[in-house]
Amino acid sequence: MRTDPRAAIAAADTALGIEFGSTRIKAVLIGPDHEVLATGGHGWENYLEGGLWSYRLDEVVAGLQSAYASLVADVRERYDVTPTSYGSIGISGMMHGYLAFDADDNLLAPFRTWRNTNTGRAADELTHLFGFNIPLRWSIAHLHQAVLDSEEHAPRVARLTTLAGWVHHQLTGRHVLGIGDASGMFPIDSTTGTYVESYLDQYEALVENRVPWRLRDVLPTVLSAGEDAGALTPEGAALIDPTGILQIGRAHV
């Protein structure tokens, strides 16, 4: 028997999905019968920053809030109820790219998106080092290019992630990434479900005299479907919905 959507929303028996695409941020509410109950969205565009394609992180937050508010308005119009929590929340976004932070969580360089292909030298060097193809857009190519170019911030990198990984961290406080997204940062070992250990060793030996960090300490922890990726924090709820209506409830992210 089909679940009443209004009752499911009121009981938080729903899943909220938010996807950060290149031109649109999309929000969708799914009910217990896997039916789309409501949608929302926000349009945005990347811009050139120092010759590289980027989005500002304040635009990420503003777009998240706008897309969510749009979804809530759709829920109210359809069902005359306001959602206050969800059973689960999923975040997805553009793969690859470069979001690097220092030990105090300060952004070290403007977000470099998947569109940037200024990493030819790094990608070639890593492909030969590993004997495994490293595409221009992968996060490790962007990181190594920053090292090769002796960018001022490169020695201070403490955390590297993707757009979805950054949003997830803001919502939960956890530096983790799903295995699909992580596979666009650094090669994954299909038998262990995490980064290829021998490649980590090779890379750390390559740059040990250039930077003080170890790559394995910088990359996010890789998680597979069904593993605990954290729960929505009060700060995360306020980030999504500054009106204060959204509560943490039991939402896993």
What are these regions (language model features)?
Residues 1-7:
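A short, compositionally biased domain-edge/stem linker segment
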Residues 7-8, 18-21, 90-92:
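Short loop/turn motifs at secondary-structure junctions and domain boundaries
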Residues 10-13:
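Repeat-blade elements of multi-bladed beta-propeller folds
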Residues 15-58, 106-113:
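Short glycine-rich, Thr/Ser-proximal phosphate-binding strand/loop in the N-terminal lobe
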Residues 40-81, 128-131:
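N-terminal phosphate-binding loop and adjacent alpha-helix
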Residues 70-250:
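Glycine-rich phosphate-binding/catalytic subdomain of phosphoryl-transfer
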